[in-house]
Each structure stands twice: as structure tokens, then as C-alpha cells.
Curated annotation (Swiss-Prot):
Top class in the EC scheme: transferase
Keywords: Cytoplasm, Lipid biosynthesis, Lipid metabolism, Phospholipid biosynthesis, Phospholipid metabolism, Transferase
Pfam families: FA_synthesis
Catalytic function, reaction form: a fatty acyl-[ACP] + phosphate = an acyl phosphate + holo-[ACP]
The protein's name in its UniProt record: Phosphate acyltransferase
Superkingdom to which the source organism belongs: Bacteria
GO biological process assignments: fatty acid biosynthetic process; phospholipid biosynthetic process
Similarity remark: Belongs to the PlsX family.
InterPro entries on file: FA_synthesis, Phospholipid_synth_PlsX-like
Species, as recorded: Streptococcus pyogenes serotype M1
Length: 335
């Protein structure tokens, strides 16, 4: 049985969306147990009772505007902190939260702990593309500043995730840059390019420009955390704007526009699915001793369900256990 600890109080739509997502997951998957951390009365308002769902009551929670590290230190009974402690103590196998990103990174690093040999765990997310296959990108903001060694390690982590969770036999790795030529980029990108080219365990396809990301040019995209986060927000904003503009055009158009939209309804629905990040699950702080997954702050029921499904797959494939073994081998070789 896979045991998943969930911060029921994190996110814009908590606890309603969190609990209703859990209800759907419990019905869909018979091999999971959920531990919900938060206000018991509020949780029970939405929970469909199940012997595979436990509520661990606490009145304390970390707010979206709390200073992350300080909040984790001071709010020791916060729902997010208690969920992370459950993982550390072996009472749960993974943690999910839609709450304060910085706080989740802090509890991930300082409570759950990083895998020996991993310098900087990266925030990884699977982003939908027009091909329908998507790509994994990291770092998406766990680390604002990185070295070439960190980015090289992100390529290793991303490839490992793509192979073991998404089932891609030989993931193509691209380096996000301001041009595709080998000589492009700042010193960080140039140094990273050399490291990735020299590593024959990685299928490196070279530099990738931001405009190429959605075309499926690579399965894994490597970036420093500052740039990666900015690109992610840009992709999300563009997708929301496109769908909003389409809706506005259809609603304000004449009868011909509405008839055309009706005829294209299934195609427009497929387009919406392609651009919908909620079906891809959450962002994984990859490189820790257990799955720590950040669901979007505005997650709805569908997004929470997808994140639970994603974590279930991670536990099913034992991707973290395999990663621990992989880095243990590298550590032995380096020693």
C-alpha cells in the first residue's frame, strides 16, 4: 500500500479542492492510503469517509505570504511540516502540498533530506506540448543561482525521471539557451554545454531556444532556477491568454463564428487539453530521499487528482530508491 501525506490546508482552493481530489483518487486507486493534515472539521465537510483516509488534525498552517524558512522553524505544528515529518519518520512514503513553494522546498531539504551525492535538488515539472508528449524541465525555481555542475546534475536527474516515471527509453536532453549554436550563451551555459557534450550517459541534443520548447524538440530541458521559473510562468500565462482570447472571440462573434466554433468544438477541446497543465501533475523536488511534490497554488480537483496519480506512479516505479542506488554508485566511483 502506497502511503501519501497531503497538506490539506495549502493552496488557494484548500481544503475543498484538496479533499475532493483525494475522494476521486481513493475511488480510482485501490493501492493508496492518504493522510490528510489540517483542520479536521473543515476536511470532514468535503471528505467521503474511507478506511484508507486518515485525518491528522492541526490548527496551524503556513500562509502563502509567510517567509518560508522562518515559517518552517516557527510553525512546527503546521500541516505542511507535520506531513513532511511523517515522511521522515517512515509513516508516509511521499508528500504533496499546494501551499507556499518556498516552505515546501525548505521542509523537503531540511526535514525529508536530500540524497547523498545530489548537490542541489531541482524542481521538475512535466509541461504539455503541442505533440501531446510533453517535456520535463528543471530547475523551475528551487535554486535561483546555479553552477555548470548543478545544471549537469539536473540533466542526469531529468533523464532519470523521464526514463523511470514517463517510460522514455532514451530521453533527449536540451540546454535552454539564447541560441542553438554551440558558442551561444553566457559563461554558465557554455560551461554546461561542455559538460553535457562530454557525458556519454546523456543523450544531449544541444542548445534549445525558448520558442522551440512546445514543439517537442527534447524530452528534458535543463535550466538554472531563475530562468526556468520565468519561462514556466511565461508558458502558463500564454496558454491562459490564448484560451481566453479564443473564448472572447467566440462569445463576441456573430452567428457564423458561433456555428464555426460549434463545428470545431472537439478540436478546441483537444487544444485546451494540450495546454492544460493541471493534467500533468505537480512539480517534483527531485533529488530528495522521498517524493516531495508541489501542486500548483490554484490547483482544482483535477490537478490534485493528477498529482496523486503522478506520486502513485513515482512510488510504483520506486524512482527515488533507484536514484539513491544510482548516486551511491557514483559516490563510490568518485571515492
Amino acid at each position: 500500500m502506497k502511503r501519501i501525506a497531503i497538506d490539506a490546508m495549502g493552496g488557494d482552493n484548500a481544503p475543498k479542492a484538496i479533499v475532493e481530489g483525494v475522494n476521486q483518487a481513493i475511488e480510482a486507486f485501490s493501492d493508496i492510503e492518504i493522510q490528510l493534515y489540517g483542520d479536521q472539521t473543515k476536511i470532514n465537510s468535503y471528505l467521503i469517509q474511507s478506511d484508507r483516509v486518515a485525518i491528522i488534525h492541526t490548527d496551524e498552517k503556513i500562509m502563502s505570504d509567510d517567509e518560508p524558512a522562518k515559517a518552517v522553524r516557527r510553525k512546527k505544528k503546521a500541516s505542511m511540516v507535520l506531513a513532511a515529518k511523517a515522511v521522515k519518520e517512515g509513516k508516509a512514503d511521499a508528500i504533496i502540498s499546494a501551499g507556499n513553494t518556498g516552505a515546501l522546498l525548505a521542509v523537503g531539504l531540511f526535514v525529508v533530506g536530500r540524497i547523498k551525492g545530489v548537490d542541489r535538488p531541482g524542481l521538475l515539472s512535466t509541461i504539455p506540448t503541442v505533440t501531446g508528449l510533453g517535456f520535463d524541465m528543471l530547475d523551475l525555481g528551487a535554486n535561483a543561482e546555479n553552477t555548470a555542475k548543478h545544471l549537469h546534475q539536473y540533466a542526469i536527474l531529468g533523464s532519470f525521471y523521464a526514463k523511470n516515471v514517463r517510460g522514455i527509453a532514451n530521453p533527449r536532453v536540451g540546454l535552454l539557451n539564447n541560441g542553438t549554436e554551440e558558442t551561444k550563451g553566457d559563461p554558465l551555459r557554455k560551461a554546461t554545454y561542455e559538460l553535457l557534450t562530454a557525458d556519454n550517459t546523456i543523450s544531449f541534443v544541444g542548445n534549445v531556444e525558448a520558442r522551440e520548447l512546445m514543439s517537442g524538440v527534447a524530452d528534458v530541458i535543463v535550466s538554472d532556477g531563475f530562468t526556468g521559473n520565468a519561462v514556466l510562468k511565461s508558458i502558463e500565462g500564454t496558454a491562459i491568454s490564448i484560451m481566453g482570447q479564443l473564448k472572447q472571440i467566440i462569445n463576441s462573434g456573430g452567428i457564423k463564428t458561433k456555428i464555426g466554433a460549434s463545428l470545431l468544438k472537439s478540436s478546441l477541446y483537444e487544444m485546451k487539453k494540450t495546454l492544460d497543465y493541471s493534467s500533468a501533475g505537480g512539480a517534483v523536488l527531485f533529488g530528495l530521499k522521498a517524493p516531495v511534490v508541489k501542486s500548483h497554488g490554484s490547483s482544482d480537483v483535477k490537478a490534485i487528482f493528477s498529482t496523486i496519480k503522478q506520486v502513485r506512479t513515482m512510488l510504483d516505479t520506486n524512482v527515488v530508491g533507484q536514484l539513491v542506488e544510482e548516486f551511491a554508485k557514483e559516490t563510490q566511483v568518485n571515492d
